[in-house]
């Protein structure tokens, strides 16, 4: 079986990670004590991707939990699913990273990293045929961003031919805990560009907007935001966890989704959106799901896809529905909005259907888009970074841990290069020289 080793780092990474395990354990019929109480063979057929089968028929997540302070892990261990995880897989320090990327990456985190790698190695050795790793973390703090990216590069060194994917929570001024977020995020992106194969950008700004505008929550809490993250992660990993043909493992997903190695930052989306305690009032049909799924308001990254073009798209429908109708609806979206899909990658939209819907819904759809509009997210961080960096504000926290200003300058220019690369492919047309083919001029003008 093709296994995935899951790593969660830092407070945010551990909170969304714990939520992810709750949701998928429920979908696979795994009780909080690790016993299987499911009712369908589909639940168990590929359960080995994320779970080890221990003695006594217990299922144990292939998860490694990492933090530089004990707090978040204590609450996971004391929570409902705390007994699910292997006790040796909790690796934590005492000092904390103080929301400082340098502490996570170079000092405190670097001291703990070998202990973590030992546990990861043990998990990887227990795999029959390891396909890769997934990391949940945030880019705004110290541990998830600094130590998370350190772990990625160390894992990459040791397992160079395995796929590395990350669920990265991108900071936003709307939901801000830390004034250092733009620094931490930029330094992290600098690492992710080089060292991950696929990164799902989960943007706090977008999560906040969804809670506020769509779900009408006056004061969204992190619990509300994390609920959205967990349905998205459940949807994105459906193809990996249930039997099916399309994007059935991390490598196939990467092959379909990443046309150029640096451009591997995906925008996830989900439909229908509902608050965590509200049941969906009515079932949507396939047409409505498809329409919602492509809607900017349903995206988990605060970028408008209409400001860019899709390089590639993967869609995942869940529930009992007609395949034919799904294909028709997906074709219709592409035909009506053809200018938003680059014409130089034919068949760049892939669709999969899985019979088992998420809990509480008859059917749902998950969207993964590789769109050039994601540059808006990087521009937003870059602007905030530059505002602080040109005044050298707060830099002493980083240089005090042994960092050099040069590294900031490099990270800044790497992120700006990334933005230009997205722009370059947004403007690219099918013919090389950039000459207009006949009848193409009006289409370009309408693009502008």
Swiss-Prot record:
PROSITE patterns hit by this protein: TUBULIN (PS00227), TUBULIN_B_AUTOREG (PS00228)
Alphabetized CDD domains for the sequence: beta_tubulin
GO biological process, one term: microtubule-based process
Record has Metal-binding as a keyword: yes
Primary localisation category: cytoplasm
PANTHER family: TUBULIN
Protein task: Tubulin is the major constituent of microtubules, a cylinder consisting of laterally associated linear protofilaments composed of alpha- and beta-tubulin heterodimers. Microtubules grow by the addition of GTP-tubulin dimers to the microtubule end, where a stabilizing cap forms. Below the cap, tubulin dimers are in GDP-bound state, owing to GTPase activity of alpha-tubulin.
Record's compositionally biased regions (Acidic residues): 429-448
Region described as Disordered: 427-448
Cofactor: Mg(2+)
Protein name: Tubulin beta-1 chain
Family to which this protein belongs: Belongs to the tubulin family.
Binding positions (GTP): 11, 69, 138, 142-144, 204, 226
Self-association and partners: Dimer of alpha and beta chains. A typical microtubule is a hollow water-filled tube with an outer diameter of 25 nm and an inner diameter of 15 nM. Alpha-beta heterodimers associate head-to-tail to form protofilaments running lengthwise along the microtubule wall with the beta-tubulin subunit facing the microtubule plus end conferring a structural polarity. Microtubules usually have 13 protofilaments but different protofilament numbers can be found in some organisms and specialized cells.
Listed GO CC annotations: cytoplasm; microtubule
InterPro entries from the UniProt entry: Beta-tubulin_BS, Beta_tubulin, Tub_FtsZ_C, Tubulin, Tubulin/FtsZ-like_C, Tubulin/FtsZ_2-layer-sand-dom, Tubulin/FtsZ_GTPase_sf, Tubulin_C
A Pfam match: Tubulin_C
Subcellular compartments: Cytoplasm, Cytoskeleton
Key words, A-Z: Cytoplasm, Cytoskeleton, GTP-binding, Magnesium, Metal-binding, Microtubule, Nucleotide-binding
The organism of origin for this protein: Brugia pahangi (Filarial nematode worm)
Highest rank taxon of the organism: Eukaryota
GO molecular function: GTP binding; GTPase activity; metal ion binding; structural constituent of cytoskeleton
The keyword Signal is assigned to this record: no
